[in-house]
Every structure is written in structure tokens, then in C-alpha cells.
Amino acid sequence: KRMGLEYVDIFYSHRVDENTPMEETASALAHAVQSGKALYVGISSYSPERTQKMVELLREWKIPLLIHQPSYNLLNRWVDKSGLLDTLQNNGVGCIAFTPLAQGLLTGKYLNGIPQDSRMHREGNKVRGLTPKMLTEANLNSLRLLHEMAQQRGQSMAQMALSWLLKDERVTSVLIGASRAEQLEENVQALNNLTFSTEELAQIDQHIADGELNLWQASSDK
């Protein structure tokens, strides 16, 4: 009613609720589809094990799990480490990565400090997830290396970060935010080069440290 819609395309369980049995969550998701309030259902920030269980619970209702929305980017690779993409592929579930640009870190905006016109400067430690304390020397070193790699590829850092995600056929799409049309146009150009050399991938794996940016780690670790 508040949205003024008769139904939504996708209804998400946005993260694990330890106080609610998964059977109850699955039932609520299934009811949303069966009552015509949602066309499909998805989950977000679920571990591979919880994802598998949700797939099986929804099957009992004859409802497919359409999509998983994990936080995933070059500085936040819990999806790789956990094997989540394999779980999704094995069950025919799509993946839409949110925070693909690490809330702006992977745009190059913070390479030389915190700009005065940035959200981090305006809100400081109030920002959900991205705070000044995350501009560690390790993260800054990773950003500098990524910036150099992007230049060598003829891309902006943001474009390369999106390309890195979309090169994997198991990643259906990425969820980006843009405050200006120019940002959207720049991001879309990431599709022009989704190919990475073996050397580039090895360099990323060896030298880019995990930035500890998993926004809902408490959920995805369960």
C-alpha cells in the first residue's frame, strides 16, 4: 500500500533473522508469491549453507528461489571464499552483487584522502559500512594498485571493478547507485571490456587485500 503497487517484481528476505526459523521465512516468501503480491522471491546476505536450505524449503512450496543479492566487490570477496557462487549455480539461482564499488572506494574518489564533497566527509562515522577508519593503509595500497591496473586497461577504476564482477557468468548483474547521469554512462561502459588476462587476475588475487567491507557479515557468516 505504501508503495502504491498491486505487486512487486521481487520480494527479498534481506538478511538472516536469527529470531525467526527459516521455515517461517520461506513460508512468508512463498505466501507473497501465491497471494499475487510478488512475482518472484530472493534472499540477500545468506551463507551458502543457508542459501541451500532456503532453496530446499521453497521447493516444498513449489516456489523457485530466483536471486541472491550479496555484498561483493574487489575489496570484499567473501562470496569467493565461501563458495556461494557455486551453490547458486548448482541451484539455478542468479546473483546480483550490491556495493560493487564498495560504496565509492572503488571509484578512485578516496585515493588522495576524503574529499569535502563526499558522503564520508559529510557524515563521518555515521555512514553505514563506509567510514574513515576503513581508509587503512592496506586498503589504500590496494586502491592505488587497482587504479594503476585500470589505467593500463584503458578503464576507470569503477569500470574495471564492475568488469571484474561481470566477467563471471555466474554473476547476473550488479546493483549500482549513481547521483549523476555521467556516472551511469561511465559505469555502463564497463561492459565494453569484460576480459582479464591471466596475469591481471593473478595480480588481483595476490596483491589486493580483503578490505573487511562485508556490510552484513553477521548474516552471511551464519
Regions found by a protein language model. Give the residues of each.
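Beta/alpha (TIM)-barrel catalytic core signal, keyed to glycine-rich beta->alpha loops juxtaposed to Asp/Glu
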Residues: 20-206
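Short coil/turn segments at secondary-structure boundaries
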Residues: 216-221
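Amphipathic, coiled-coil-like alpha-helical segments
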Residues: 210-214
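Active-site groove signature of glycoside hydrolases
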Residues: 1-20
